């Protein structure tokens, strides 16, 4: 009769041992952009039509679109890295203003081809990639989710629906994404929102700033090696 409690204790101990607790220290800067100059080092996927804008403006990257948009770093990342940036969702009467979808892709790869940059910006175009994805304030600012894509499955790792983990308008958020020794983590304003130890960790791939139907800005982006 005592086997079940002992088994549960053993399982709990195994889970605790598998938690992500070490994250290294930020080291060499691999890439940084303050978006004050020409838009270089990025590949942009979105519907190019009147009213849609993805460009550097007033010292920030501006994404002002009525559909999906992804701004990819034009080079892959490998190994233990930390990505940090400031991001704001603008709600101020603009035609695309909508409080939703502060999203990020990282460690993205296309299992079928070497060229990742073949998509239109529509969200469903990315379903067949392998990647990590965080969607803060998705579904009209009702959910915040961490997913792992792979083999055609968009596995839900964790989710929040409470107001503390949803978006506020016109606020600058410090977003930090880390990949370290088989774990990935998302922090917002210094608070850890998600950690995940991946049994099949994604160790290299592309990073993308992602949104759908909104007006957002990005600033002070830095990517560092984690030692």
Named regions from a protein language model:
Residues 18-227:
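Extracellular glycan-recognition regions
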């Amino acid at each position: 009769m005592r086997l079940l409690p002992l088994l549960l204790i053993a399982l709990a101990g195994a889970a605790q041992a598998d938690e992500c607790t070490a994250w290294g220290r930020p080291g060499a800067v691999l890439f940084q952009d303050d978006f004050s100059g020409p838009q270089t080092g990025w590949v942009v996927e979105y519907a190019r039509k009147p009213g849609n804008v993805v460009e550097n403006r007033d010292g920030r990257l501006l994404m002002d679109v009525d559909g999906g948009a992804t701004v990819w770093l034009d080079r892959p990342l490998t190994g233990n890295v930390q990505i940090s940036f400031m991001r704001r969702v603008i709600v101020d009467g603009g035609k695309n203003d909508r409080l939703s979808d502060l999203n990020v892709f990282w460690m993205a790869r296309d299992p079928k081809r070497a060229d990742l940059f073949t998509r239109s910006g529509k969200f469903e175009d990315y379903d067949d990639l392998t990647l990590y994805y965080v969607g803060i304030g998705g579904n009209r600012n009702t959910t915040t989710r961490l997913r792992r894509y792979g083999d055609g499955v968009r596995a839900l790792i964790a989710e929040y629906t409470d107001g503390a983990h949803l978006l506020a308008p016109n606020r600058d958020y410090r977003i930090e994404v880390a990949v370290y020794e088989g774990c990935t983590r998302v922090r917002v304003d210094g608070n850890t929102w998600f950690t995940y130890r991946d049994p099949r960790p994604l160790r290299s791939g592309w990073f993308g700033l992602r949104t759908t139907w909104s007006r957002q800005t990005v600033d002070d982006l830095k990517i560092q090696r984690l030692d």
